[in-house]
């Protein structure tokens, strides 16, 4: 991940106030060492100055997680606006319990079921009025080729 990678992701991202970076925790040290180009000594990453507030990269909040691919893989960092994500609740949360199977051990089994799915409401990037620039509310960094 380089400064150029991040600025190109911003270039192709549908700019909104709700955009956040979601990055692999294995990348956490990389932006901390990056600075703006041309001798500007300020880091592109800023730690939160307040408890409960996220760190930022290039002014956008960043969430560090192990739920995305490891550093060097496609999707290890992405810029997302989750307001462009639909959630489909297929079944309300249901609870059930039984002691039939483990009755002799004086135990009860519990089951909770919630059927839910989600997906972006835009399947492809869209072209801006200039006829060439494409943007999307979901932009990921591709895999490294080195």
Mark where each language-model region is.
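Structured, hydrophobic secondary-structure cores that serve as assembly/anchoring elements
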Residues: 1-146
């Amino acid at each position: 991940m380089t400064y150029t990678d991040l600025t190109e992701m911003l270039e192709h991202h549908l700019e909104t106030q709700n955009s956040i970076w979601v990055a692999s925790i294995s990348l956490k040290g990389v932006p901390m060492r990056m600075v703006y180009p041309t001798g500007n000594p300020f880091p592109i990453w800023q730690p939160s100055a307040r408890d409960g507030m996220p760190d930022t990269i290039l002014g956008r909040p960043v969430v560090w997680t192990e739920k995305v691919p490891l550093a060097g893989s496609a999707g290890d960092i992405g810029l997302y606006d989750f307001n462009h994500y639909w959630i489909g609740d297929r079944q309300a949360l249901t609870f059930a319990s039984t002691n039939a199977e483990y009755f002799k051990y004086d135990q009860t089994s519990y089951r909770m079921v919630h059927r839910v799915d989600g997906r972006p409401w835009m399947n492809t990037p869209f072209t801006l009025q200039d006829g060439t620039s494409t943007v999307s509310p979901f932009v990921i960094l591709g895999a490294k080729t080195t």
